[in-house]
A protein has these predicted regions:
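Conserved AdoMet/S-adenosylmethionine-binding subsite of the radical SAM
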Residues: 2-123
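Auxiliary Fe-S-binding modules of radical SAM enzymes
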Residues: 89-166
Length: 166
């Protein structure tokens, strides 16, 4: 999470903007709002991970609610940043038509127009292992891009610019 490196990222992003470089950041947005408001002005395009639209379920599975994330996401949109919501599609968490409709309701409410559906994979398992953490998804199969087409269709039918993969 690049935005967790507050001092470094602030100086780094300032420098990039001074050089006229278009800055793209991928983030969970789970940082303090005041810091986010300061740093957002140095970022042109945001890829914003939104793991679940329901704060209770989000907290159950990630350990944190999504209120701070959604506050920062809404702020980025309010200052006219180019924002794409990225949804890591995870089995037994958010990979369902029912949850897709919950995302749609949330995204319409806050003004998201672009969505990337990211198929679940096992790439993160090694990171958990290196950190000595339990990986709760080791027995889950990867989700093929083909399996996301029905969810993509739901988003498209509801007026979103959507693609599978990022």
């Amino acid at each position: 999470e690049p935005l967790m490196q507050k001092e470094f990222m602030t100086e780094f992003l300032k420098r990039l903007k001074q050089e006229g470089i278009h800055v793209v950041a991928e983030t969970t947005g789970c940082v303090e709002h005041e810091y986010f408001k300061d740093i957002i002005h140095y970022i042109d395009t945001l890829y914003f991970d939104v793991k679940h639209p329901d704060t209770k379920i989000h907290k159950e599975k990630t350990g944190k609610g999504n209120a701070k994330i959604l506050e920062n996401l809404q702020y980025a949109l309010s200052v006219n940043k180019d924002v794409t919501a990225r949804i890591p599609m995870i089995p037994d968490f958010n990979f369902s038509n029912k949850t897709a409709y919950k995302y749609i309701e949330l995204f319409k409410k806050i003004g998201i127009k672009k969505v990337h559906l990211l198929p679940f994979h096992q790439y993160g398992s090694e990171k958990y292992k290196m950190l000595g953490l339990s990986y709760g998804y080791k027995n889950f199969e990867n989700i093929a891009k083909e399996e996301l087409k029905p969810i993509k269709k739901i988003f498209k039918e509801n007026g979103f610019e959507v693609r599978i993969g990022g």
